[in-house]
């Protein structure tokens, strides 16, 4: 068996995946046409040309791993940012059936990567679906997950995402709404959007409430802000169980050592809508792995980049240089860091062990 086949079939958990970012170009085209969206280009062209422009290069002048300041080699003539594309998807959603559809399709696509468990970040309900409400949105997502459980034998959970461009009171109100109606499929909260738009300490009260309500906690950190301190804040003040991204933790040796010793899970993605940053991302992930950090590959916005979790594993092997043995460890680490109750996690752990043993019988470990 070729290594590519091995990595495609390796069982995986995707712990960092945004529902809106999973939407297929064809699905967006359907939704946009029905909604009558006034778009600057055909939906398929927009998806092909998603390319977010990096922030001010001066912010990254002194980072340990150099951040590219010029254009990438594959940038389109006209670029559409990931965030603008996400806004168009949100505006095109017409009701609960659309949400169930995109959730199911997210799992269907993940299944092709041998992904056995997915945790989806979801945003608050868009204005045109105010009558559905946040909990109606959650129910529609759960309907999609249950269909995927039936059809693909997968498991899934949801992460309610706080938009860090909002103020502290809005975040607190959102978490109250999340906590007011517990749902077994809604496992925790996250902190998303451009890191420079909102420091983690702004959301301390919201995270404290989430913890008191028994919700798990993660946050995008040390991704756009070239500092490790945000990750320390997420761990110590926000009480995060995991860190999403975390590349700039490499700026602080003491924090790297602490995270290594504590086994803090970092969900990392080598592909990004900032095409010029992809080499830097891959170098950072390689350095994090070399430092002994608990890095777990994820897909982030696979429909829009585009990528897949199997593709991320192949990049890790072929471009970053991680061994099959290390990627097996990441596969298992993913299920250990999943927000599943003990019985479900034990079942998933046993399934991963069985599937990996069967693969290793075909492909000698290396």
What kind of feature is each model-predicted range?
Residues 1-215, 223-242, 248-366:
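Metal-cofactor-binding active-site regions of metalloenzymes
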């Amino acid at each position: 068996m070729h290594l590519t086949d091995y990595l495609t079939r390796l069982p995986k958990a995707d712990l960092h995946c945004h529902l809106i970012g999973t939407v297929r170009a064809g699905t967006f085209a359907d939704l946009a046409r029905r909604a009558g969206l006034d778009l600057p280009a055909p939906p398929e062209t927009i998806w092909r040309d998603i390319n977010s422009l990096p922030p001010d290069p001066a912010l990254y002048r002194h980072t340990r791993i150099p951040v590219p300041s010029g254009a990438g080699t594959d940038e389109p003539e006209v670029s559409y940012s990931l965030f603008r594309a996400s806004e168009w998807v949100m505006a095109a959603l017409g009701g609960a059936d659309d949400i169930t559809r995109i959730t199911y399709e997210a799992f269907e696509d993940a299944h092709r990567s041998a992904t056995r468990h997915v945790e989806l970040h979801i945003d608050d309900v868009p204005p045109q679906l105010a009558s559905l409400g946040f909990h109606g949105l959650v129910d529609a997502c759960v309907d999609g997950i249950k269909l995927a459980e039936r059809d693909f034998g997968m498991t899934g959970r949801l992460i309610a995402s706080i938009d860090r461009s909002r103020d502290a009171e809005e975040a607190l109100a959102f978490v109250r709404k999340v906590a007011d109606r517990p749902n077994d499929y809604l496992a925790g909260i996250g902190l998303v959007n451009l890191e420079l738009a909102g420091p983690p300490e702004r959301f301390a009260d919201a995270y404290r409430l989430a913890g008191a309500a028994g919700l798990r906690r993660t946050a995008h950190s040390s991704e756009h802000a070239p500092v490790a301190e945000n990750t320390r804040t997420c761990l110590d003040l926000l009480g995060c169980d995991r860190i999403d991204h975390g590349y700039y933790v490499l700026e602080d040796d003491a924090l790297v050592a602490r995270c290594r010793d504590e086994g803090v899970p970092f969900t990392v993605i080598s592909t990004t809508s900032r095409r010029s940053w992809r080499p830097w991302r891959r170098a950072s992930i390689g350095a994090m792995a070399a430092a002994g950090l608990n890095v777990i590959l994820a897909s982030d916005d696979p429909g829009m980049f585009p990528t897949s979790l199997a593709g991320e594993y192949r990049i890790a092997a072929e471009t970053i240089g991680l061994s099959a043995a290390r990627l097996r460890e990441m596969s298992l680490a993913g299920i250990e860091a999943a927000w599943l109750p003990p019985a479900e996690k034990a079942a998933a752990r046993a399934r991963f062990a069985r599937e990996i043993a069967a693969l290793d019988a075909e492909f000698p470990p290396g």
